[in-house]
């Protein structure tokens, strides 16, 4: 999927200069929340703590960057690491992958103005390899449709903080 055009949001602008390279430009003091390994759909994800951190970021106008493994997505029959007993009850359905992506979209929509970057982790790249779909690109596209400015990055890469 294509990256969005640079747009100012949360006091900053992000421009993709390649799949794994982004320039983050801001004119004034900017706060950031950097998180990773959320494993949102895992039964052990501490969603109360996640909500607390995202609400704090929202209150401060901080830009949120999520660096890999937002998703767990290990409970499909195609993943040898899966364990059905670890599956959250709301995802026990025939369309497991879609249910998790839809739930993520619903959850992150309330934070669409501060979620600025989603980076791929091994859980996302595993789904891309086995299922030929990108959950993060799907989420980011909907957040942009709803007025956000979310960029997707690769498994590795660079963020350059400075002028565009």
Predicted stretch roles:
Residues 2-7, 19-35, 40-153:
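Core catalytic region of metal-dependent phosphoesterases/phosphodiesterases
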Residues 11-13, 17:
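Acidic, low-complexity intrinsically disordered tails
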Residues 154-158:
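Short, acidic/polar N-cap/turn motifs at the starts of alpha helices
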Residues 159-164:
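Short, intrinsically disordered, charge-balanced linker/junction segments flanking boundaries
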């Amino acid at each position: 999927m294509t990256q969005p055009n640079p747009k100012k949001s949360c006091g900053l602008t992000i421009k993709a200069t390649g799949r794994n390279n982004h320039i983050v430009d801001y004119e004034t003091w900017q706060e950031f929340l950097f998180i990773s390994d959320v494993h949102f759909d895992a039964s052990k994800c501490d969603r109360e703590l996640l909500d607390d951190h995202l609400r704090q970021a929202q209150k401060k106008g901080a830009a949120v960057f999520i660096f890999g493994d937002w998703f767990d997505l290990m409970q499909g029959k195609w993943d040898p690491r899966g364990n059905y007993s670890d599956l959250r009850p709301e995802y026990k359905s025939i369309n497991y992958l879609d249910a998790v992506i839809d739930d993520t979209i619903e959850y992150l929509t309330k934070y669409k103005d501060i979620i600025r970057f989603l980076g791929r982790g091994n859980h996302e790249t595993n789904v891309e390899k086995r299922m030929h779909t990108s959950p993060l690109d799907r989420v980011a596209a909907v957040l942009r449709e709803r007025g956000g400015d979310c960029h997707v990055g690769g498994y590795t890469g660079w963020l350059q903080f400075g002028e565009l």
